[in-house]
From Swiss-Prot:
Similarity comment: Belongs to the universal ribosomal protein uL16 family.
GO process annotations (BP): translation
Gene3D superfamilies referenced in this protein's UniProt entry, alphabetically: Ribosomal protein L10e/L16
Gene Ontology CC annotations of this record: cytosolic large ribosomal subunit
Keyword Endoplasmic reticulum annotated: no
Protein name listed in UniProt: Large ribosomal subunit protein uL16
UniProt entry keywords in alphabetical sequence: Ribonucleoprotein, Ribosomal protein, RNA-binding, rRNA-binding, tRNA-binding
Alphabetical list of PROSITE patterns matching this protein: RIBOSOMAL_L16_1, RIBOSOMAL_L16_2
Protein's UniProt keywords contain Nuclease: no
GO molecular function terms listed in the Swiss-Prot or TrEMBL record: rRNA binding; structural constituent of ribosome; tRNA binding
Native source organism of the sequence: Gloeobacter violaceus (strain ATCC 29082 / PCC 7421)
UniProt subunit comment: Part of the 50S ribosomal subunit.
Gene: rplP
Function of the protein: Binds 23S rRNA and is also seen to make contacts with the A and possibly P site tRNAs.
Length: 148
């Protein structure tokens, strides 16, 4: 499962998840992608389950890009512990996902295969998501400053 090799601090505060993703919201590597539509803390187990579902479906064709990484430790106290006596030990790792964030990308397969692989992956995730295709729009010609 995914987790950082080392971190500067063992524990983090929870923080908030307001607003849409302002980075990581465009397709960069592949042709097809799965985009989150809701905010969530996505665990490393969920990311791994989705990756396995996609890999199993597309077999040896194509390439999968995982665009999220769980870098936030979540702590838990032991059950039936009295209040106080500090924060619990880190139990698992999560990735803070905001709406609009690209989760996975696929390249090198047909659209039907990519769509089905993403559907299987989305079933493993706790949020609504959508399948998107990279738009092949050519950049507009820039106006020249030459006098006419």
């Amino acid at each position: 499962m995914l987790m950082p090799k080392r971190t500067k601090f063992r524990k983090q505060q929870r923080g908030r998840m307001n607003g849409a993703a302002c980075r990581g919201n465009e397709i960069e590597f592949g042709t097809y992608a799965l985009q989150a539509l809701e905010p969530v803390w996505m665990t490393s187990r969920q990311i791994e389950a989705a990756r396995r579902a996609m890999t199993r479906y597309i077999r040896r064709g194509g390439k999968i890009y995982i665009r999220v990484f769980p870098d936030k430790p979540v702590t838990q106290r032991a059950a039936e512990t009295r209040m106080g006596s500090g924060k619990g030990a880190p139990e698992y790792w999560v990735c803070v996902v905001k709406p609009g964030r690209i989760l996975f990308e696929i390249d090198g397969v047909a659209e039907e295969i990519a769509r089905e692989a993403m559907r299987l992956a989305a079933a493993k995730l706790p949020i609504k998501s959508r399948f998107i295709v990279k738009s092949e729009t050519a950049p507009a010609e820039e106006p020249t400053n030459a006098p006419t």
